[in-house]
């Protein structure tokens, strides 16, 4: 249950914004970072693998042992390529591709050989140098190729085991004629036979004793050299004979059954097509995981080459992800900030106009503003308007687990910008790496962040004066930035991107309506909608237009009417009305009187203060934001930048009007419905006493600054002091102010009992009252004398009890 007033922001919000001390949530841009190149060379000598210790026998011997030799060789060499002509760079691509900062953009062959990836790890001067030999992507390629080789080998030679198969006793394969196999079967010398089509493998019964095998095998006569080789391996290996069955001869299964010979097909568990396929799939999965973690753009001629595009050129330099080009015509409501950046773009396009007058471009421009005000949109407009390379990065991409990686990326980033000068570097959310190093905003020291910041400071102050490289930084926390980064020479300009005023909001609405080609109804006036949206940022207005279009489409309308925009504003402020959750019984009656109390007190305040808006709508339909009721007071038609003391007192009384109505109607039996009202009133009263200096006892003192011990050059407090007695005094004054506001609200409610009860009953029945029906009741409201005294600032002697106590 809340009372929501769309009045202009309070003065303290404006002051905090102007000093860039807002701690609002951050606005993140999907950007990227550069990753430092590492050139490498990889040459692997051929490795020879003799499967199962095959033995080379003379070809003249009929039973010569078949030799199995496999030569595996892997080599990787990559060629350098020149940088492309397109010039919008996303640093995340650079991070994922790891391009060489020293080798890019060189078309000369001699220069291209330097730091090349096809070099060995030693230099031409025969001096050993350590360089990374292999990268994650190439490990995956090696695994994939190795898996393919093993798969092909297993298909060709099914007897060879693959990695992951069951361990086997080392075996020596000997090839013999098929006639010898038949002879051994007939002589009952065969123990086991494995038949795989025309290929037959068999083992003799005396395989355990090599000497016996040699003497009993009459049909297999080996030379002396072969016998010597067999004796050297026989104690640890078994002998398996292989042969090939002719097509017109059958396998002697009857004789093998008669001799109790164990026969069957080969054991496929150690290989076979299925297991080989699983192994290959495993290697492919490993490669896919590596490529997902370290993506590679195969469309480029070089793996580490940064993808570039010409901004604003014929190639369609488009920054946004959907391919849409952003220009300054798409930016509205921030004319001052746009003018500053247009001057920078003009300098890059026509530098002679400024150079002949002795002017130099600003080294850096820092964009500061609340989230949603358009800092990133301005940077995109610069990329779309400028005809120079535009490199965008997020500051968080510079920070890595390993110390030194961030500084390396900063060096690569600025090295590329210098090569392509004139160019622009945009670093979004720069406070991620540029926080103050004095420990005030860092509870724990971080060497990686400090080294990255030091490298950033060095690069920004080390530009050649003739190279037009401009750095754009964006942040909504300028108060935490290191002073060394904000000084002239690094960030020469600090551009504040503020929330738009009424004219700016109208311009923003026109831009979004025209871009979406939104069909508007005849009753839509964008100027009036801009008046209803005081305090909205550019992002809020863009969302408002989209919500209005969605609401119109939900009702199958052909145009977007004014009522759609009004409902969209209400959704943005109070949330979405719940369709199923409805208040019933006593709760519904309490909420109706509560909202009627806000309306009665707010109308009484508006009658005493000129230029104040009146209540236009009451609702007791629960909303998604948790509010059970809704009182809508539109903002004034003109933007307000100051809040006077009488207006502040009037807001306090209006906020506590709902609680006062509950006390009067239900004779002190109050509910918890005033939770949000009390929070907002307490915050407003505390700032009036402790920050605005609107209390006579405290005086014009900033309690926070006094308690902290002053403000240093960076805008923070150097040390803190215990000011317990001052805090107690502030708490007492805040309590007195809130109690006085509640007492005044009670007097207003008691002065208008008929209006309170009649309006509350109608709201309870209809759940929503607005327009002429609401104004009929509110026109009968009469302000009390105590309200007039309180609004004028005469806080003392409001009630007899307070007068006697004072």
Curated annotation (Swiss-Prot):
Q: Which UniProt keywords apply?
A: ATP-binding, Chloroplast, Hydrolase, Membrane, Metal-binding, Metalloprotease, Nucleotide-binding, Plastid, Protease, Thylakoid, Transit peptide, Transmembrane, Transmembrane helix, Zinc
Q: Which residues bind ATP?
A: 369-376
Task: Report the cofactors.
Answer: Zn(2+)
Give the enzyme class. Answer: hydrolase
Q: Where in the cell is it found?
A: Plastid, Chloroplast thylakoid membrane
Note how many cofactor molecules are bound and how: Binds 1 zinc ion per subunit.
Specify whether Transferase is a keyword of the entry: no
Principal localization reads: plastid
Q: Which InterPro entries match?
A: AAA+_ATPase, AAA_lid_3, ATPase_AAA_core, ATPase_AAA_CS, FtsH, P-loop_NTPase, Peptidase_M41, Peptidase_M41-like
Might you give the EC number(s) for this enzyme? 3.4.24.-
Q: What does this protein do?
A: Probable ATP-dependent zinc metallopeptidase.
Q: Which PANTHER family match?
A: ATP-DEPENDENT ZINC METALLOPROTEASE FTSH 9, CHLOROPLASTIC (PTHR23076:SF130), METALLOPROTEASE M41 FTSH (PTHR23076)
Q: Give the family from UniProt.
A: In the N-terminal section; belongs to the AAA ATPase family.
Official protein name in the record? ATP-dependent zinc metalloprotease FTSH 9, chloroplastic
Question: What organism is recorded for this protein?
Answer: Arabidopsis thaliana
At the highest ranks, the source species' classification is:
Eukaryota, Viridiplantae, Streptophyta, Embryophyta, Tracheophyta
């Amino acid at each position: 249950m809340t009372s929501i007033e769309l009045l202009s922001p309070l003065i303290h919000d404006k002051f905090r914004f102007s000093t860039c001390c807002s701690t609002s949530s951050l606005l993140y841009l999907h950007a990227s970072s550069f990753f430092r190149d590492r050139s490498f060379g990889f040459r692997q000598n051929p490795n020879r693998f003799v499967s199962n210790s095959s033995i080379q026998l003379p070809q003249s011997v009929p039973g010569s042992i078949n030799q199995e030799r496999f030569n595996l060789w892997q080599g990787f060499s990559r060629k350098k390529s020149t940088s492309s002509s397109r010039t919008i760079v996303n640093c995340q691509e650079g991070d994922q591709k790891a391009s060489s900062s020293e080798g890019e953009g060189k078309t000369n062959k001699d220069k291209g050989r330097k730091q090349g990836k096809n070099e060995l790890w030693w230099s031409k001067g025969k001096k050993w140098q350590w360089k990374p030999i292999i990268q994650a992507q190439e490990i995956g390629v090696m695994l994939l190729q190795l898996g393919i080789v093993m798969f092909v080998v297993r298909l060709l030679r099914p007897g060879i085991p693959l990695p992951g198969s069951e361990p086997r006793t080392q075996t020596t394969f000997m090839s013999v004629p098929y006639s010898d196999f038949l002879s051994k079967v007939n002589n009952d010398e065969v123990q086991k036979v494995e038949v795989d089509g025309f290929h037959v493998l068999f083992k003799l019964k005396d395989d355990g004793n090599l000497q016996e095998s040699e003497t009993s095998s009459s049909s297999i006569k080996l030379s002396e050299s072969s016998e010597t080789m067999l004796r050297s391996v026989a104690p640890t290996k078994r002998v398996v004979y292989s042969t090939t069955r002719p097509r017109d001869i059958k396998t002697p299964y009857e004789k093998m059954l008669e001799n109790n010979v164990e026969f069957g097909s080969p054991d496929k568990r150690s290989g076979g097509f299925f297991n080989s396929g699983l192994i290959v799939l495993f290697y492919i999965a490993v490669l896919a995981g590596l490529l997902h973690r370290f993506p590679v753009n195969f469309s480029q001629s070089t793996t580490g080459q940064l993808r570039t595009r010409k901004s604003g050129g014929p190639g369609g330099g488009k920054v946004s992800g959907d391919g849409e080009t952003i220009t300054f015509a798409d930016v509205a409501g921030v004319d001052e900030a746009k003018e500053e950046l247009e001057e920078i773009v003009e300098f890059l396009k026509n530098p002679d106009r400024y150079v002949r007058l002795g002017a130099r471009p600003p080294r850096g421009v820092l964009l500061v503003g609340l989230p949603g005000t358009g800092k990133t949109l301005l940077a995109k407009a610069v990329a779309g308007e400028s005809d120079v390379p535009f490199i965008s990065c997020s500051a968080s991409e510079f920070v890595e687990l390993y110390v030194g990686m961030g500084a390396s990326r900063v060096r690569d980033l600025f090295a590329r910008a210098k090569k392509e000068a004139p160019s622009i570097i945009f670093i979004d959310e720069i406070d991620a790496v540029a926080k103050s190093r004095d420990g005030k905003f860092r509870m724990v020291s971080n060497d990686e962040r400090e080294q990255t910041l030091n490298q950033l400071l060095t690069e920004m102050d080390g530009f050649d004066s003739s190279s037009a490289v401009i750095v754009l930084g964006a942040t909504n926390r300028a108060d935490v930035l290191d002073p060394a980064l904000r000084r002239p020479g690094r960030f020469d300009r600090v551009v504040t991107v503020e929330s738009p005023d009424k004219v700016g909001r109208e311009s923003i609405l026109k831009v979004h309506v025209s871009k979406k080609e939104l069909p508007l109804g005849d009753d839509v006036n964008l100027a009036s909608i801009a008046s209803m949206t005081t305090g909205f940022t550019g992002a809020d207005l863009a969302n408002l237009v989209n919500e209005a279009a969605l609401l119109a489409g939900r009702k199958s309308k052909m145009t977007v009417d004014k009522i759609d925009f009004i409902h969209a504003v209400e959704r943005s402020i109070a949330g979405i009305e719940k369709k199923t959750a409805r208040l019933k019984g006593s709760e519904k009656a309490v909420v109706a009187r509560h909202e009627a109390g806000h309306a009665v007190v707010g109308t009484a305040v508006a009658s005493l203060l000129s230029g104040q808006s009146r209540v236009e709508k009451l609702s007791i339909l629960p909303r998604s934001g948790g509010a059970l009721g809704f009182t809508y007071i539109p903002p004034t038609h003109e933007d307000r930048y100051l809040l006077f003391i009488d207006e502040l007192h009037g807001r306090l009384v209006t906020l506590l009007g709902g609680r006062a109505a509950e006390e009067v109607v239900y004779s002190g039996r109050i509910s918890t419905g005033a939770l949000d009202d009390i929070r907002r009133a307490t915050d407003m009263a505390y700032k009036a006493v402790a920050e605005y200096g609107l209390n006579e006892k405290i005086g014009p003192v900033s309690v926070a600054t006094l308690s902290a011990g002053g403000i240093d050059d960076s805008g923070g407090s150097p040390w803190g002091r215990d000011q317990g007695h001052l805090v107690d005094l502030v708490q007492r004054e805040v309590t007195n102010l809130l109690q006085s506001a509640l007492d005044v609200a009670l007097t207003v409610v008691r002065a208008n009992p008929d209006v309170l009860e009649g309006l509350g009953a109608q709201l309870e029945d209809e759940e929503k009252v607005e327009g002429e029906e609401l104004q009929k009741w509110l026109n009968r409201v009469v302000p009390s004398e105590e309200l007039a005294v309180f609004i004028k600032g005469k806080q003392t002697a409001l009630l007899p009890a307070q007068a006697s106590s004072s």
